């Protein structure tokens, strides 16, 4: 933070006010109002037709799947779904918008008044972030600026033009860059879970605009700085950095000129990644500047209650519910549940299958976090390609819980199974490891206690740590014995004496 910003913070209490507009490309096979494919990566201007090029006389035909995916998203975001929505023309000129207007939604969006819960910084409590609306519109084309050649060429690719875009607008409820990232992470998780979008930011299927201003407490009076919209942020890291920079810039700006929201217009700024700062673009247009009016080529869309209910029934268990269930049903830590859920449905299924075989949620969670995910990262593979089936991992973990293998021997078996498609029994034989029989372990412990009466007396006197000396002896006599199992059995046997 700059010296001026630090000084301003010291003089006045400052609250950061953040609202996010998230633009999500929906995962449909064709565009919103024509039959052109939405596949990413095709040569420029090869996925176009008279409709998306805005040719005279070409009429749009609505994509029903885009409506269904929008309703599905709205329901998952706790939005109200109105019985009627309509299409409006948002009129502005830009080279990558060939019609001269964008088909969007103005006063009757397809989703309204929702909320999304996010975890706070402590990871234990939740905060509810309000949603103003989510409206469906067609995406614009893409301008590609070639400044490296020295001639500042700009080329237009209209392949993206007309792709279904759901704009999700939050209330200004976020209070820090970290909260903004947490909101975006939770939203992305939900969207990918629902399979409504792939949310690949590097491909432009998820883009973020951040609205930022400050509330400064001056002698008990709240002063609001002018709102700035930071456009087209293409990574969560850039969202954080842009917000943090903008907070500092607005503090310094207010210290210098005392401009407030009442005497300065809303402006848009871009983010310069290399310079790590925002830069001025233009004054922000108001809705009247776009001259919205109902699109005469498209009928309003009716959304019967039965239609909405059928989509609601197909939602299944959402990530927030799964996260809570994993904690209560399997007894795992909130952080572990969060990581597992964030990996997606396939990892959740793998974990729960392994727990079914192991009978120990906490121990299985530990193996997932430390061993399974580490291996996936090292090998750059998904859980579908993981070489150890979930049931087999669960069986291995159960052997630890039952005292038949200690952690070190179990990890030897785990590493072996990564490269050998064998059962647990075959793997232990291949490694020369023998699972310890319960009767054999009990005989060994009785033998040790008989040879060490002083340990028995010490434990009976309340010094349970005295059994530690016998655990080492047990490992020497039988290297396959689990220290945890030996310790517990020794204490149990002494209690019966």
From Swiss-Prot:
The keyword Nucleotide-binding applies. It catalyses: L-glutamyl-tRNA(Gln) + L-glutamine + ATP + H2O = L-glutaminyl-tRNA(Gln) + L-glutamate + ADP + phosphate + H(+); L-aspartyl-tRNA(Asn) + L-glutamine + ATP + H2O = L-asparaginyl-tRNA(Asn) + L-glutamate + ADP + phosphate + 2 H(+). Pfam families: GatB_N, GatB_Yqey. Transmembrane segments: none annotated. GO terms for molecular function: asparaginyl-tRNA synthase (glutamine-hydrolyzing) activity; ATP binding; glutaminyl-tRNA synthase (glutamine-hydrolyzing) activity. Belongs to the GatB/GatE family. GatB subfamily. HAMAP family: GatB (MF_00121). PANTHER family: GLUTAMYL-TRNA GLN AMIDOTRANSFERASE SUBUNIT B MITOCHONDRIAL AND PROKARYOTIC PET112-RELATED, GLUTAMYL-TRNA(GLN) AMIDOTRANSFERASE SUBUNIT B, MITOCHONDRIAL. This is Aspartyl/glutamyl-tRNA(Asn/Gln) amidotransferase subunit B. The lineage of its organism: Bacteria, Pseudomonadati, Planctomycetota, Planctomycetia, Pirellulales.
